[in-house]
UniProtKB/Swiss-Prot annotation:
One Pfam family linked to the record: KRTAP
Alphabetized UniProt keyword annotations: Keratin, Repeat
Assigned GO CC terms: cytosol; intermediate filament
Ranges in a coiled coil: none
Cited function: In the hair cortex, hair keratin intermediate filaments are embedded in an interfilamentous matrix, consisting of hair keratin-associated proteins (KRTAP), which are essential for the formation of a rigid and resistant hair shaft through their extensive disulfide bond cross-linking with abundant cysteine residues of hair keratins. The matrix proteins include the high-sulfur and high-glycine-tyrosine keratins.
Top-rank taxon: Eukaryota
InterPro entries reported for this sequence: KRTAP_type8/19/20/21/22, KRTAP_type_19
Protein's organism: Homo sapiens (Human)
Origin organism lineage: Eukaryota, Metazoa, Chordata, Craniata, Vertebrata
Protein name in UniProt: Keratin-associated protein 19-4
Family: Belongs to the KRTAP type 19 family.
Subunit note: Interacts with hair keratins.
Amino acid sequence: MSYYGSYYRGLGYGCGGFGGLGYGYGCGCGSFRRLGYGCGFGGNGYGYCRPSCYGGYGFSILLKSYPEDTISEVIRRSFNLTKY
């Protein structure tokens, strides 16, 4: 199963992937109408983020072949960094 960890200003997600193609999305950065999402391709552990929020930033990491503790650490840091 793929794992997706991301954070945006205001809101952060840590989601499990779907099947072999892991993907997820996060919304935040000022309002719920402003979305950012990240996709990952199963097998190579690559992820990217396209934040559409103005004045903000975000990143996404798709972890497929990394240990569980690394995944939980990324997700934990994500929520800590976006705590308001």
